[in-house]
From Swiss-Prot:
Ligase is among the record's keywords: no
Domain of life of the organism encoding this protein: Eukaryota
Modified residues (Phosphoserine): S83, S145, S147, S328
Protein name in the entry: Dynein axonemal assembly factor 8
GO biological process, one term: outer dynein arm assembly
Biased composition, class Basic residues, residue ranges: 177-188
Biased composition (Basic and acidic residues): 163-176, 310-322, 337-349, 359-380
Biased composition regions of type Polar residues, renumbered to the chain: 144-155, 198-211, 323-336
Keyword Cytoplasm listed: yes
Function of the molecule: In cyliated cells, dynein axonemal particle-specific protein required for deployment of ODA to the axoneme. Interacts with outer dynein arm (ODA) subunits.
UniProt keyword list: Cytoplasm, Phosphoprotein
An annotated Gene Ontology molecular function: dynein complex binding
Length: 481
């Protein structure tokens, strides 16, 4: 036992500390991905997408390329410094993308830190053939964007080499480089087919700064004329200017009426177009208005199927369409016929209007009021007035039957029945319609009737006050007053 275990044993152990110690062994640590209970080790599953869906990064492939081999298989070296030490320059490095330049510049900076006595053994292994700087051609001028990345680094970019190298490449290295180039070309073709199908014209014609990258990738396959027509439909303005829109407008109503004659109409339109290619004289404004009217008529028939049109009318409309195409002199006459037919259809479809006369008949009211007043005073006079009023009622009813509806006649009969059912004992003053009738009478007649009524009423009251049971006999007749 160690000293730590002795220290722990010497202290008094409580039951709570023992429980915590036992539980701490079973708890997983932060570094472990699974608890101690999981004895079986399982490999974690990593989801990966399909490779052709993603655009691959070609920088890794360019980094793995054999250094110093160009497309023709020749080895190129060039040097800028006047020192006798050779400088290794790959022939394809001038056309590499800028991202690859950054990778190579970082590698060179890392190599400079190792000191001047370090030997470039990796370069010897990857590119075993070098030429002297005097025999190598000068770097091409006029391409600032394609200059090597170490041109600004000065003498630190030169690498001292140990020993003499061979002047010819081996056959195995040449075959391996050819195989790699073939695989790279096949993969580029696959990428252009499956991934880069929707390449815009700007991407196909890049700027002058990216000409090196385009030269490296090689010429892309140009879209043929058939593939270009399969995309979006393109209409040039020259074709639209050559079309005659008037003839197209003429053919539209005919296509809606009958679809079978579309081929013959198109042939007729093409024949007229060939004849009048230089100058096309469009129809007048009247013909266009007539065609619009016919089109509206056909659309209204489709929207309102309840209108039943005979076969003769349909034939007439077809004949009108043919006449509009053949001759334009009868346009005004045909438009009038169309307007007349539209008006006749409106008149047929609209129902007749019904008028109800609910006015009160007032001429018979004053006569009835006079008959009620006279019936209170004497039976003979009341009978004569009732006969006169009864004779006036049928005259009014016969006059009203001519110019009134059934509802108004029923209302008038009901009003007459109610007036006939009123008891004769009620006076004109107490009756509900007495005040209205008196207000409507003339001023002269109303004053004389009031005077007579007041005199009769005063005499009747005097007789009742005297207690004469035969007071009614003292009342004079209507003729004696």
């Amino acid at each position: 036992m160690t000293s730590k275990d002795k220290a722990v044993v010497s202290l008094p152990v409580s039951p709570w500390d023992a429980i915590l110690k036992a539980a701490k062994d079973q708890l997983p640590s932060l570094d472990s991905d699974s608890s101690l209970s999981d004895c079986e080790e399982e490999e974690p599953f990593i989801f990966q997408r399909n490779q052709p869906v993603l655009i691959p990064d070609l920088t890794e492939e360019l980094a793995e390329d054999p250094v110093g081999v160009d497309e023709s298989g020749t080895w190129v070296t060039a040097g800028r410094s006047p020192s006798p030490e050779p400088l290794l320059v790959p022939g394809r490095l001038a056309i590499e993308p800028r991202s690859e330049w950054m990778v190579r510049s970082k590698d060179l900076a890392h190599q400079e830190r190792r000191g001047p006595g370090w030997s470039c053994q990796s370069c010897v292994k990857s590119s075993p053939i070098l030429l002297d700087t005097k025999e190598a051609p000068a770097w091409p001028e006029g391409r600032g964007s394609q200059s090597p990345p170490w041109s600004s680094q000065g003498e630190g970019a030169t690498f001292p080499l140990e020993g003499k190298l061979k002047t010819e490449p081996s056959d195995t290295d040449f075959k391996n480089s050819a195989k790699r180039r073939a695989l790279r070309r096949e993969r580029r073709k696959m990428i252009e087919r499956e991934i880069l199908q929707k390449v815009t014209q700007a991407a196909q014609n890049p700027a002058s700064g990216d000409q090196g990258q385009v030269a490296e990738l090689g010429p892309r396959p140009k879209a043929t004329s058939e593939q270009s027509w399969e995309g979006r439909p393109v209409l040039s303005l020259k074709q639209l200017e050559g079309w005659d829109l008037d003839y197209i407008l003429q053919s539209l109503p005919g296509q809606q009426g009958s679809q079978g004659d579309s081929a013959s109409r198109s042939a007729w339109w093409l024949a007229d177009r060939c004849q009048d290619q230089g100058h096309s004289t469009g129809p007048s404004q009247d013909i266009l208005l007539e065609q619009l009217a016919l089109l509206c008529a056909t659309q209204s028939r489709v929207r309102h199927p309840t209108w039943k049109v005979s076969a003769d009318k349909l034939q007439d409309t077809e004949e009108q369409v043919a006449r509009t195409r053949s001759a334009s002199a009868e346009s005004g006459f045909q438009t009038e016929r169309v307007q007349k037919r539209a008006e006749s259809r409106r008149l047929k479809t609209e129902p007749p209007t019904v008028f109800l006369d609910l006015r009160l008949t007032e001429p018979s009211d004053p006569q009835e009021h006079q008959s009620q007043e006279s019936s209170e005073h004497s039976s003979s006079d009341s009978e004569e007035e009732e006969v006169g009023s009864a004779g006036s009622i049928p005259v009014a009813s016969s006059w009203e039957q001519r110019y009134c509806t059934g509802k108004s006649q029923l209302l008038q009969q009901l009003r007459a029945f109610r007036k006939g059912a009123v008891p004769p004992q009620l006076s004109a003053k107490d009756g509900p319609g007495g005040q209205k009738d008196q207000a409507q009478e003339d001023t002269g007649g109303s004053q004389t009737q009031r005077k007579k009524h007041i005199k009769l009423w005063a005499e009747k009251q005097n007789a009742l006050n005297l207690g004469d049971p035969l007071g009614t006999r003292l009342l004079p007749g209507m003729g004696q007053l």
